[in-house]
Amino acid sequence: MSMRLARLLIPGFSALALAACATEGDDVADAGDPGPPAAVSTIGPPRLTADLRDSQGRVRARATAETVADSLRVRVEAVGMSPGAYGAHLHTTGRCDPPGFTTAGPHWNPTDQKHGKDNPAGMHKGDLPNLLVGTDGRGSFEYTIPNAGLSGMLPNRLIDADGASVVIHAAPDDFRTDPSGNSGARIACGVLG
């Protein structure tokens, strides 16, 4: 090897050797500054589901919630329920202790509104349409809540430290009466997870 080529290669190999000695995450320019903390994902879970169980533990419905753009889309599908109309709501706590499911907390209401789409001072973000169940014991709805999401950077996030749940009530929601639309007892509940 010529002397000229050796003078060109030696500094390059020296730099490579020094770089190989550094461990991942070392900051050669300022080893005393640990830098900013690692970024935390703000996207959150793409979709959460819940099996809504009655006080005997039987699954009566399945709920799915997902963030779509700047909205929260909720779908509820019932199976094995008596025909009729039932109020359904998102609740603030991810806990469903039978028999009354009061551990699910109040309706999700991050904007501090009154209850119901027909209430001039309403509505809660957690207000959902009535679940209409046919003679075959099945029913479903899909509903989109604007300016809301599961988690992340959206202003109205459903999921916080204590989670959230979906509750079905014994009677239809009148979409007006505060706080729960005269929808009666909580008959099925599921934790979103």
Protein language model features and the residues they cover:
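C-terminal motif of bacterial Sec signal peptides marking the signal peptidase cleavage site
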Residues: 17-20
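N-terminal leader/targeting pre-sequences
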Residues: 22-85, 90-193
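Intrinsic disorder/low-complexity segments
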Residues: 10-11, 38
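Bacterial N-terminal signal peptides that target proteins for export
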Residues: 1-10
